[in-house]
C-alpha cells in the first residue's frame, strides 16, 4: 500500500476491456497510471531499457530507429521461456520504479495502476488497497483481440495461455467488473466503483 494515495490495482486478460475501464476512471478524476504506456516509453528509441535489452539479446530485437522490435521480441519470448524471464528481469524493475514515481506525483483523489500481469506478479500484491479485475468470457476475449489486432486465433490463445487463468484472476479480485456486455454496462459498473473508491480514499486519507 502506498502511503500517499489510496491505490487500486486494475487488471484483466488481453481483450478484457481494462483500458476502457481505466479511461472511464480517468474521466471521473482518478489518477490513472498505465504500466503498458510506461513499458512502451522504456522500449521506445532512447528508452532506458533499450541498451540492456540490446546487451542481452543483440541487435536482432532492435529496430533500425532504435526501438524494441516487438514482434521479434514477442516471438523469441514465446519460443524461449528463459528469454522471457530475462526480458522480464530487465523490464519489470524499471516499470516498478517509474510507476512508483508516478504514483508519488499523482494528482487526484486516488490512484489506479493498470497492470496487465498483476495476478502473475505476486511481488505487486502488497501494494494495493483494492484489486479490481475486468472480466469477460474467454471466447469474447479471443473475438475482441482478433478483431482489434488481426492476430490468428491460435496466437491469441497462446497469449491467453501464458496469462493467469480467468479463475485465478477472479479469486484474487476484491472487485470485479463484468465486461461481457456493452460500453454502457461497463461504465455503469465503473461509476459505482469510483464512488466506492472515493469514499474509501476519503476515509483513509
Curated annotation (Swiss-Prot):
Pathway(s) the chain acts in: Cofactor biosynthesis; coenzyme A biosynthesis; CoA from (R)-pantothenate: step 5/5
Catalysis: reaction(s): 3'-dephospho-CoA + ATP = ADP + CoA + H(+)
GO biological process: coenzyme A biosynthetic process
EC number(s) recorded for this UniProt protein: 2.7.1.24
Record carries keyword Manganese: no
Top-level class of the enzyme under EC nomenclature: transferase
Primary location: cytoplasm
Keywords of this entry: ATP-binding, Coenzyme A biosynthesis, Cytoplasm, Kinase, Nucleotide-binding, Transferase
Keyword Amino-acid biosynthesis on entry: no
Pfam entry (one): CoaE
Cell location: Cytoplasm
Annotated positions binding ATP: 15-20
InterPro entries (alphabetical): Depp_CoAkinase (IPR001977), P-loop_NTPase (IPR027417)
GO function term, MF aspect, one: ATP binding
GO annotations of cellular component type: cytoplasm
DPCK domain boundaries: 7-204
Biological role: Catalyzes the phosphorylation of the 3'-hydroxyl group of dephosphocoenzyme A to form coenzyme A.
NCBIfam families: dephospho-CoA kinase
PANTHER family in UniProt: BIFUNCTIONAL COENZYME A SYNTHASE-RELATED (PTHR10695:SF46), DEPHOSPHO-COA KINASE-RELATED (PTHR10695)
Family: Belongs to the CoaE family.
Protein name: Dephospho-CoA kinase
Source organism: Aromatoleum aromaticum (strain DSM 19018 / LMG 30748 / EbN1)
